[in-house]
Amino acid sequence: MKNSIREEIINHPAKKLFDIVIDIESYPEYIPWCTRMVINERKDSEIYADMYVQYKFILAQKFGSHVKFNSNNLTIETHYIEGPLKDLTTNWKFEKINSKKSKIIFNVNFEF
């Protein structure tokens, strides 16, 4: 399994960045290869969703995911359910530095 961790300081409030990432319905508007998002189930702090991805001439693929999030701690965990990969998990953490600046920690694990 491959792992990548990235940390960035961003000049935006942590809560605003969290809200952008958790708004998965909007992904097709700004992620070029994401053609459609389908929300299968939404609970208080969980979402079951399918992302449809098409890259160049490759047929569209569906990635099913279980997303857990905590609005108070500003964390998001995504667990892969189905699709063309063997495994995929992501973790987001948004830390407030001050009212206008935050630190994003993004961790992704995947296996083809």
Predicted regions and their residues:
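Hydrophobic ligand-binding cavity/cleft-lining segments
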Residues: 1-46
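Glycine-rich portal/gate segments that line the openings of hydrophobic small-molecule binding cavities
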Residues: 38-82
